[in-house]
UniProtKB/Swiss-Prot annotation:
It comes from the Bacteria. It comes from Methylobacillus flagellatus (strain ATCC 51484 / DSM 6875 / VKM B-1610 / KT). NCBIfam families: rplO_bact. This is Large ribosomal subunit protein uL15. Keywords: Ribonucleoprotein, Ribosomal protein, RNA-binding, rRNA-binding. GO terms for biological process: translation. InterPro entries: Ribosomal_uL15, Ribosomal_uL15/eL18, Ribosomal_uL15/eL18_sf, Ribosomal_uL15_bac-type.
Length: 144
């Protein structure tokens, strides 16, 4: 066997369909588009959601809800995740840089789930009673 004699297996490669190339091809004349109608014409496709001039569904249905300007983008953090942050002081910025919380979070609440294995300093975060006790039990401190 030589590199210049290698060929694909018989039937492994299919010829591209060439439409509009005679009756014998099976795709001659109308080229698989059928007869007449919008879809047979060049450029004959309507936009998504178009219903032929009828008021489309997305405009018939009423608008619903609103986006509150004062919504609280609060992220929840487990106490086990605090240990993943290698900063001396754990605040919102440190949690974002460690990819523990999303970048859009504006407030953080830490709740008890998992162990705090080292002393950490938590600054500017809300903590549940259990999380507060776990951080203090590990020798850490909480700065409001």
């Amino acid at each position: 066997m030589k590199l210049n004699t290698i060929k694909p297996a018989e039937g492994a490669k299919h010829a591209r369909r060439r439409v509009g190339r005679g009756i014998g091809s099976g795709l001659g004349k109308t080229g698989g588009r059928g007869h007449k109608g919008q879809k047979s014409r060049a450029g004959g496709f309507h936009k998504v959601g178009f219903e032929g001039g009828q008021m489309p569904l997305q405009r018939r249905l009423p608008k619903r809800g609103f986006n509150s300007l004062t919504k609280a983008d609060t992220a929840n953090v487990r106490t086990a995740d605090l240990v993943r942050v290698e900063a001396d002081v754990i605040d919102i910025l440190a949690l974002k840089q460690a990819n523990v919380i999303p970048s859009g979070a504006r407030a953080v609440k830490v709740y008890l789930s998992g162990d705090v294995t080292r002393a950490v300093t938590v600054q500017g975060l809300a903590l549940s009673k259990g999380a507060r006790a776990a951080v203090e039990a590990a020798g850490g401190k909480i700065v409001e």
